[in-house]
Amino acid sequence: MVVSLKGRDLLCLQDYTPEEIWTILETAKMLKIWQKIGKPHRLLEGKTLAMIFQKPSTRTRVSFEVAMAHLGGHALYLNAQDLQLRRGETIADTARVLSRYVDAIMARVYDHKDVEDLAKYASVPVINGLSDFSHPCQALADYMTIWEKKGTIKGVKVVYVGDGNNVAHSLMIAGTKLGADVVVATPEGYEPDEKVIKWAEQNAAESGGSFELLHDPVKAVKDADVIYTDVWASMGQEAEAEERRKIFRPFQVNKDLVKHAKPDYMFMHCLPAHRGEEVTDDVIDSPNSVVWDEAENRLHAQKAVLALLLGGVKTGF
């Protein structure tokens, strides 16, 4: 199937078909191979990406900057102080102005509505680098990693343990679209958004995958192929951190919990990790951990997104 993504936004993976997600993953795989063998892939020569950061990040900034450099383009970093938003300029006007200068906008924001508004008023592709609702680039890197390591995504049991947050949302959406068996285990009251749960159930029915929401981490990770976790308190939730530590303690991924998974299970984490909280050193540093490969794949997945949305690659490989 010929799939063109030129000119599209990437705000949430629910907006993408399974075929479109596979186009991104296959393109990422090819670009990763080209990088390893030293084959030039300057597919976005002369293109510029504006990167808006309301929230700081190591992986997002570095991976997008390096991605544009590898593709022959340029990335422009803009933090909150660099923009006029704090002085009264609207997101709509910011989007309109940036669209006259750059070829795409990546935004890492607190409120998902901000990235939606950027996309509404920009005339160039807008990429969600993270919002409080979703983290699509992370999920693309996650499933690229699972595909590499397991040889498939369909039928793989992917278990997310912890807070039903933006990372959980994107993991649920992408996994159920691609036929994985996705299980989410959270404490009572910290479940994913009800809308995302419905999407996951609908996606699974269409793909042949499955989705299950539990509140028992031991039951959830039984025979897991992948165990995934994230921090218990995200940026902006610092005031809740102490209370969350108490509530989430039974959901720590440690050597006792992972005993219930398959012996060859993979441990995944979007990073940064709070060692000793959501995961212990003996898990994240174990041979089962693939977090560094997963972090690397942010680069390759985002190169694929950029190349496809900006037209450097027309239909994937």
UniProtKB/Swiss-Prot annotation:
InterPro entries: Asp/Orn_carbamoyltranf_P-bd, Asp/Orn_carbamoylTrfase, Asp/Orn_carbamoylTrfase_sf, Asp_carbamoyltransf_Asp/Orn-bd, Orn/put_carbamltrans, OTCase_ArgI. GO terms for molecular function: amino acid binding; ornithine carbamoyltransferase activity. The keyword Kinase does not apply. L-ornithine binds at residues 166, 230, 234-235. It is found in: Cytoplasm. Signal peptide: none annotated. Its EC number is 2.1.3.3. It catalyses: carbamoyl phosphate + L-ornithine = L-citrulline + phosphate + H(+). Keywords: Amino-acid biosynthesis, Arginine biosynthesis, Cytoplasm, Transferase. It comes from the Archaea. Carbamoyl phosphate binds at residues 57-60, 84, 108, 135-138, 270-271, 298. Reversibly catalyzes the transfer of the carbamoyl group from carbamoyl phosphate (CP) to the N(epsilon) atom of ornithine (ORN) to produce L-citrulline. Belongs to the aspartate/ornithine carbamoyltransferase superfamily. OTCase family. NCBIfam families: orni_carb_tr (TIGR00658), PRK00779.1 (NF001986). This is Ornithine carbamoyltransferase. The gene is argF.
